[in-house]
Curated annotation (Swiss-Prot):
Residues 1-15 form the signal peptide. The keyword Transferase does not apply. GO terms for molecular function: serine-type endopeptidase activity. It comes from Penaeus vannamei. This is Chymotrypsin BII. Serine protease with chymotryptic and collagenolytic activities.
Length: 271
């Protein structure tokens, strides 16, 4: 059971050639945070990893939600973006920015698309954080190019111990004033669900966790973004520890493989 669930709303200023251009908006991260049930001995860490090579993750989407919230997403077809339910729950509209690396700059590669057609999983539970998955339908197919590509869905599950790579514009440090200007990535191993559940108590079959004990992980602003491996997305950034991003507690992702039937039913997209 959850001792306490809090939504950390971190205000961050963004000014770029995408939806934030010329507007004094203050973006908030809706990433859910859960109180750990056990103590993890870990030293403070830089959570953001390293800056990604520009456009090396061309399926990565930046989501500007209701002029207020920021999340990530994955382009799984020319018309569909995969993200987290906690990002889209109660939203009115979303600006989907594709082809971006630096979200504070007006990059020629960026394409911005407004959508009001999206939905969360029918059994999304914001208290237990189950079924944390959502889909965004673009109003028309986006043109694919070297900077904007789709990512494949996995045809098999990811094994414990496998090194995977989450990506996003989330905060690189707990002390950071806002999200990262540039897309970042970090390599981390998959851990067992039993070990992850020992920390949070809410980890079911639809969740996959990464071991952050080595000093790496995701943070606020990474919500909804992909967990990458071999050209496929195995997870959707879901929740982390209320103790902070730098203390070494596991990070949890929605397990994409578990939801393949649901994704196919809604979009027709298959592995």
């Amino acid at each position: 059971m959850i001792g306490k669930l809090s939504l950390l709303l971190v205000c961050v200023a963004v000014a770029s050639g995408n939806p934030a251009a010329g507007k004094p908006w203050h973006w908030k991260s809706p990433k859910p945070l859960v109180d750990p049930r056990i103590h993890v001995n870990a030293t403070p860490r830089i959570v953001g990893g390293v800056e990604a090579t520009p456009h090396s993750w061309p399926h990565q989407a930046a989501l500007f939600i209701d002029d207020m919230y920021f999340c990530g997403g994955s382009l799984i077809s020319s018309e569909w973006v995969l993200t987290a339910a906690h990002c889209m729950d109660g939203a009115g509209f979303v600006e989907v920015v594709l082809g971006a690396h630096n979200i504070r700059q007006n990059e020629a590669s960026q394409v911005s698309i407004t959508s009001t057609d999206f939905f969360t999983h029918e059994n999304w539970n914001s208290w237990l954080l189950t079924n944390d998955i959502a889909l965004i339908k673009l109003p028309s197919p986006v043109s694919l190019n070297s900077n904007i590509k789709t990512v494949k869905l996995p045809s098999s599950d990811v094994a414990v111990g496998t090194t995977v790579t989450p990506t996003g514009w989330g905060r690189p440090l707990d002390s950071a004033g806002g999200i990262s200007d540039v897309l970042r990535q970090v390599d981390v191993p998959i851990m067992t669900n039993d070990d992850c559940d020992a920390v949070y108590g809410i980890v079911g079959n639809g969740v996959v966790c990464i071991d952050s004990e080595g000093g790496k992980g995701t943070c606020n602003g990474d919500s909804g973004g992909p967990l990458n491996l071999n050209g496929m997305t195995y997870g959707i950034t879901s929740f982390g520890s209320s103790a902070g991003c730098e203390v070494g507690y596991p990070d949890a992702f929605t397990r994409v493989y578990y939801y393949l039937d649901w994704i196919e039913q809604k979009t027709g997209v298959t592995p």
